[in-house]
Amino acid sequence: MPSPSPAHTSFPAAQVWPLSARWFLVLGAISACTSVVFSAAFAHLPVFAGGVPTAVQTALSQQQFHSLGLLFTGLALRVCGASRWLQAAGWLMLVGLLLFSFNLYARHVLAWDTFRALVPWGGAAWILAWLALAVGLAQGSGRFNRQS
């Protein structure tokens, strides 16, 4: 009987999760990069000739901070292994970036006010992300466990 092709090979969940860790690391780095690009661009946009609005400055600082949170979540997944809580933390960080920071950018740069009501949900997503991260780290597995 022929051996199964790689497309039909099943992998345990623990082997699949590091791909998620890698993506959270990559997306965290890209988000950090875009926050620097946006900071520089916003400083020179004619629409902000009178100064960058406080809401945009807040969005930038929150994007930078939560980009680090994404990087940390990716590292935690690498160290702790498969964890639904850590996975949820990463996704909630991403949702928060979209609903909070990118929504405020669109609102102030493009005058796009369509999803203004979703901004607080981005903040709520970040709160839940940090709680999920705490639970995931507290449960621990792999090289990081409860005895450490």
Residue ranges and their predicted role:
Residues 2-148:
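Polytopic transmembrane helical bundles with strong interfacial aromatic enrichment
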